[in-house]
Regions:
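Secretory/organelle targeting and membrane-embedding segments
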Residues: 1-160, 164-508
Length: 508
């Protein structure tokens, strides 16, 4: 799980980005590769080939990578770093469904390998709309690119961006195509949340500190809340988002991964498969959701006009590209229960949405109150539950909330914070998530990536919810004002179970 300080001793590598002229390359992938190079973490011979349908010259693509990195990188890239890579950056124009274009790409890779007289590792990064995942994967297989140096330390690898399907059936279909062309050890399904420092540290906090693991169970935990909220609307992604929605776009991947890491049992080792095995077991322990009736465990909503940060915001149906009869949810919350020894009876509350009160991603573990023998009888004590808040963004860090006596002649209680912030402790220039994930993929370490059965298990839980909502049409799609924390029914979901949402009050 821990990356080496340098991998310059590894074989030459070619990174091929499909969809290279897109926004992800400009904002994340280009800057990540150049930052890895600046830290001497790339192989000595490293090449970057952009692949796309546009006719772009090598010089134009180099300028695109350099300029976008200057704009989006977490730090200034040295001229020396750029010069060392510049001549190795090129662009290959081609179609995603034309096999001949993939043969041409293969010939380009062969020529580089012949020039170096050394076996080359290929890392194919699929950064395209999901509609072209299938032809890219099929043509990587048919052209022989997927099988290059199979079962050797330089075998080809492929990174696939989410979404990993739209439901269980499509996830199964995608995995079938992947498994037909690649071995699972070659496949890296990427969720950039897993590359964030706080998420990486979650297993360390749980299993390297004896104060947490003994109380990390149903005997001491009252509830777990996971929030991934955004204060922005759909902006220019209206067309894509309306085909997706909050459940598909955020909960099925980001939020469910956070749940798995929070709830999983200790792995037998830090080996990638040991960790991923336990994540799958945690997901498999989740009970099917109750989708209707008085005990329903799901809520959905759509934002209407409101105020966000003091400015007027339009409603979802007024956004560009959104049909007036849309039934897509921009907010979803769930109450999940686990059928296992550790978590039996502990609700896991999940929520995600757009145009909410603030941008925040965090896990809140609420512990049970102590017996109200000493401090619970008198209201002046104001006994609050202990909370462990794991902030993923913004301001990555961990805060433990405890009760303490306030100064004075009377015994009065007040919650206090024991806080740790990554930036305060380690400085602000920590690596971006994509840097860690690309480096791990180059090293063949799948710890922070999603395995095929993980994706299928998650979809197996959520597909019945999507089917129910589709059949209900607009019934139950509750409106909430932009700038609030979502539908009223989301509050009732917790209140009816003896809890309330904790995120967004005095945290973040």
């Amino acid at each position: 799980m821990e990356p080496p300080s340098s991998i310059n001793s590894t074989p030459p590598t070619i990174v091929v980005i499909f969809g290279a002229s897109g926004d992800l390359t400009a904002r994340k992938l280009g800057p990540a590769i150049l930052n890895l190079s600046m830290d001497s973490l790339l192989p000595f011979h490293c090449y970057l080939i952009g692949y796309g349908r546009k006719e772009i010259s090598d010089i134009e693509f180099r300028n695109y990578i350099k300029e976008s990195t200057e704009k989006h990188s977490r730090r200034k890239i040295s001229e020396e770093t750029w010069k060392s890579l510049e001549e190795n950056v090129s662009f290959h124009a081609g179609s995603y469904d034309n096999l001949e274009d993939f043969h041409s790409l293969s010939a380009q890779i062969d020529s580089i390998e012949k020039k170096l007289d050394q076996a080359i590792q290929c890392l194919f990064y699929i950064s395209t709309p999901p509609t072209v995942f299938k032809p890219i994967l099929e043509n990587l297989g048919k052209s022989g690119l997927a099988k290059r140096h199979r079962n050797k330390h330089v075998e080809s690898k492929v990174i696939i961006e989410k979404p990993f399907g739209r439901d269980l059936a499509s996830a199964n279909d995608l995995n079938a195509i992947i498994n037909r062309r690649f071995a699972e050890t070659q496949v890296f399904r990427i969720d950039h949340y897993l590359g964030k420092e706080t998420v990486q540290s979650l297993l360390v906090q749980r299993f390297a500190n004896s104060i947490f693991e003994p109380v990390w169970n149903r005997n001491y935990v009252s509830s777990v809340q996971i929030t991934v909220s955004e204060n922005l609307g759909v902006e220019s992604r209206g067309g894509y988002y309306d085909r997706s929605g909050a459940l598909r776009d955020m909960i099925q991947n980001h939020v469910m991964q956070l749940l798995a890491l929070t709830a999983m049992e200790p792995p037998s080792s830090l080996d990638p498969e040991s960790i991923r095995n336990e994540k799958v077991k945690a997901l498999q322990a989740l009970k099917p959701l109750v989708v209707s009736g008085d005990n329903s465990e799901i809520v959905r909503g759509v934002y209407s006009q409101g105020l966000v940060d003091g400015e007027k915001a339009i409603g979802y149906l007024q956004e560009e590209g959104i049909p007036q009869d849309s039934i897509t949810e921009t907010y979803a919350s769930l109450c999940l229960q686990m059928e296992n020894w550790r978590w039996k009876g502990v609700p896991f509350y999940l929520r995600s949405g757009k145009r909410l009160a603030m941008k925040a991603s965090e896990i809140v573990v609420q512990f049970k109150r102590p017996p109200e023998i000493l401090f619970g009888k008198d209201s002046k004590y104001a006994l609050s539950p202990n909370l462990l808040v794991i902030r993923i963004q913004p301001n990555e860090g961990i805060t433990l909330y405890l009760n303490s006596k306030t100064p004075g002649l009377e015994t009065r209680l007040q919650p206090i914070e024991l806080a740790f912030g990554y930036e305060t402790t380690f400085g602000s220039n920590t690596p971006e998530a994509y840097e860690r994930l690309i480096l791990d993929a180059l090293n063949g370490d799948g710890t922070l990536f999603i395995r095929g059965d993980e994706a299928e298990t998650s979809w197996g839980l959520l597909s019945p919810v999507l089917d129910y909502w589709q059949n209900q049409k607009s019934k139950g799609l509750e409106s909430y004002a932009a700038g609030t924390w979502g539908p009223i029914s989301a509050d009732k979901l917790l209140l009816s179970r003896g809890h309330e949402w904790l995120t967004g009050t005095n945290f973040c």
